[in-house]
Amino acid sequence: MARAFRLAAMLIGGVTALGLFGFAVAWLVADHWNGVTAQPAAAEPSLPDVGWPVYAGDPGGSHFSGAWQVNRDNVTRLAPAWVFRTGEIGEGYTSVYKHTFQATPILVRTTLYFSTAFNRVFAIDAETGAERWRFDAGIDPEPHYTEVSNRGVVYWVDPDARAGQPCKERVFVGTLDARLIALDAASGERCTEFAGNGEVALKAALREADRGRAYPVTSPPVVIGDTVVLGSGMIDNWKAHLGLGTVWAYDARTGELRWKWHAIPRDPSADNAADWLPEQAARTGTANVWSPLSVDTNRGLVFAATGSASPDYYGGERLGNNRHANSLVALEAETGEIVWSQQIVHHDLWDYDLPAQPTLADIERDGVRVPVVILPTKMGMLFTFHRDTGEPFFAIEERPVPASDVSGEQAWPTQPFPVAPPPLVPHRAMTENDAWGLTPIDRDECRKLIASLRSEGIYTPPSLQGTIMIPGNGGGSNWGGIGWDQQRQVAIANTLHFPFVVALIPRDDFETVRDSGLYPDTEFSPQLGTPFGLRRKPLISSWEMPCVKPPWGTLAAVDMVRGKILWQVPLGTTRDLSGLPFGLNYGTPGLGGPLITAGGLVFIGAVMDDYLRAFDIDTGEELWRGRLPAGGQATPMTYQLGGRQYVVIAAGGHGSLGTSRGDYVVAFALGD
């Protein structure tokens, strides 16, 4: 995935360069980041404070704020209010090329708390950006971490502690090296009563055989009552027997393990044991929860979206539907017991793990407010379930999908499709007629390439000849998730539209093919313990041009009452991919999510040009864009404080995506 995104950066840059020769320029952009903050508009003393207490704004993941000072009439007056720099751009770390800055800060009274990729935690003044304290988790710089990112922290108040007592208010952060750390929110010092030294080692709760090489915690923990819950990332496609994907729950005061849950049934008494062959369940790994969790405090539920069983592209060592992998699971917060589970992908062969935070919403139907959970997916489909029972809100059909032609593989014959809303990305089979290019030469090359590959639409299994994955394993949707406007009953989703080519390689040929030089800029993975290795890259020509027409990234609004797409527009230009002072409005790949405000606006960065944008939520019209000092591959947040509304985003770039690097947190507010 990492190399594929870097390649996507190069190829879209090439599109921009060649776009000089006859392709329409969307707009000219001469602005550059200069670091100068604007003269602020006068504060409005009567403006109430509006907070952002947790990642995504609320425990249910709505990415919505009731702040309204900035609205459709005045958004063009937004300008930088303050800039904070962390000093971290990954230098000195072996995994610097994977460095990202994906954090979304949280607001507690007048302090913003956030984390960096290498697990430095900062507390800064929310009105000025002045630093209050910092903490360094001391991450070892030498290992090759599977992903270098951290999307945030969580805050908790101990109601039993006396006022002013150290660690009455705590900030929790998960780390790249599989630790959960508790910090005093006032000082940034470790809470030593938490597990004795202020941290717990997640792997200590697992058997040695289930620990795997890495357990990076990339999403923020959640708190429900006095329980801290978190999942973890995992290395992909290295081998079949990887670490066991686990959700952990700890006592927020003491660090004592309260429960742990995993999707793959090591225990024969597990509710899904009958769906697995015992010997395969014993050696299959992952099905981890690396995406953000959601919490329903009133119901005492934690919602977890699980990933793929290992490895991603060959399932002959894990026959069956692999129940609870690739599933939305509702867990009892007190016990970790399953309340309900809905599998979204059966027997995943495409790395279609569930990457996004489940979003809790109430949808009006026939005058009745129905509590639901909405799940965006890499397949570009939105699945919606009743929060109490897991019953589909929109009906789900099991539709036949293509069979595998690979020896030993048994692809599941059907896959779930919601009848509404329609998919936000194409699912159809690709033919030679779909080939796209900037010239007849590369278009003809793409035509021949498509004709040589297997393509029968979404869920076409991997093959030895090569299969077109549509959409690719980056999505559809990814970890940025969706935004939810409760009043409008509208979901906002940004999606990628970029097919990939996946080919299996017989084990005896893997090293020869990998080292042949015939497949430049291709990701190779061994999938040890199976008969096949893997190669994967975007569907492009040898000119590094896309073989599919734009847009390659979009932003959409979906009416969740009727299950209809209201609007869908390209998101992102090629402005920062070629060194030229303009960009083509083709839409680009992106990572990050939307922010919705009561001012009728959708804010989003995410894509491969260095801008934060504001859209009209009702029409999809772009109303404003603000230049960033580096790539904005993070989800913005907002708050009203001291009579002003601030819109804040981390701008540090994304090493794998290829955007410009930095260490900035930028706050925008209305200027004069």
Functional labels for PLM-detected ranges:
Residues M1-A17:
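N-terminal Sec-pathway targeting helices
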Residues V50-W52, G60, T86-E88, V108, ...:
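Acidic, proline/glycine-rich low-complexity intrinsically disordered segments
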Residues W52-A56, Y97-F118, Y145-R179, R213-K239, ...:
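Repeat-blade elements of multi-bladed beta-propeller folds
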Residues P59-G66, E88-Y93, F122, D312-Y313, ...:
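Short, solvent-exposed loop/turn elements at domain surfaces
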Residues G66-V75, P80-Y113, G138, Q465-G474:
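Asp/Glu-centered strand-loop micro-motifs enriched in Gly/Pro and often flanked by an aromatic residue
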Residues T76-I89, V121-P143, V157-R162, L180-G212, ...:
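Extracytoplasmic/lumenal domain signature
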Residues P461-P499, L504-P506:
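Segments forming glycine/polar-rich beta-alpha architectures that bind adenosine-containing cofactors
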